């Protein structure tokens, strides 16, 4: 009969590794979050999907899910969530946030243009000279005529045609830079 060598484990010699216990509920929450990330990927257009760094298996699964309906779609999204659990989802999430924020950034730029237009019509020359300092290649005469006609339209309670034209001109001027 062979003798077994007994291994004596000395707990004091080992480095203390901190064990992090994760609850089952937290694991489920993480899985659900990844499943929702998968749903967002499925709802993207082809051009936006190309901007996201996906491996080929995940990309194929997402493209298949875009063609499925109802229960098959639900199962495919579950599968996409499973694939996302196996990889690091941070780069995917960052790329998705960048795509989603692009629309909000565009809206913020348009809102700033509206405020600038209002300032041009209300303040007149002071705001006009500030704009010309920032954008010296602007058509000074055309913009000045638009501002004057917008002020007249406001005084006479006419439809704000020039007001809209100022916005379009500013949009063309500023967003092209």
Swiss-Prot record:
Spans through the membrane: none
Short name of any one Pfam family annotated for the protein: DarP
GO cellular component, one term: cytosol
Cytoplasm in keyword set: yes
UniProt keyword RNA-binding, yes or no: yes
Record keywords, A-Z: Cytoplasm, Ribosome biogenesis, RNA-binding, rRNA-binding
GO BP of this protein: assembly of large subunit precursor of preribosome
Record's subcellular location: Cytoplasm
Database matches in InterPro entries: DarP, DarP_sf
GO terms for MF: ribosome binding; rRNA binding
PANTHER family named in the record: UPF0307 PROTEIN YJGA
Entries under HAMAP family matching the protein: DarP (MF_00765)
Protein family according to the UniProt entry: Belongs to the DarP family.
Summary of the function given for this chain in its UniProt record: Member of a network of 50S ribosomal subunit biogenesis factors which assembles along the 30S-50S interface, preventing incorrect 23S rRNA structures from forming. Promotes peptidyl transferase center (PTC) maturation.
Protein name (database record): Dual-action ribosomal maturation protein DarP
Source organism of the structure: Histophilus somni (strain 129Pt)
């Amino acid at each position: 009969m062979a003798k077994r060598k007994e291994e004596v484990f000395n707990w004091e010699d080992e480095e203390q590794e901190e064990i992090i216990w994760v609850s089952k509920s937290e694991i489920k929450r993480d899985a659900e979050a990844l499943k929702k990330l998968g749903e967002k990927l499925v709802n993207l257009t082809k051009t936006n999907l190309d901007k996201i760094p996906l491996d080929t298996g995940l990309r194929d699964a997402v493209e298949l899910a875009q063609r499925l309906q109802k229960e098959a779609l639900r199962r495919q999204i579950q599968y996409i969530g499973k694939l996302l659990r196996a990889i690091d989802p941070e780069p995917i999430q960052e790329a998705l946030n960048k795509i989603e924020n692009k629309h909000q950034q565009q809206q913020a730029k348009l809102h700033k243009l509206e405020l600038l237009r209002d300032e041009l019509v209300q303040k007149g020359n002071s705001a006009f000279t500030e704009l010309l300092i920032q954008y010296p290649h602007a058509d000074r005469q055309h913009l000045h005529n638009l501002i004057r006609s917008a002020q007249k339209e406001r005084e006479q309670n006419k439809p704000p045609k020039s007001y809209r034209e100022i916005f379009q001109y500013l949009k063309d001027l500023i967003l092209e830079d």
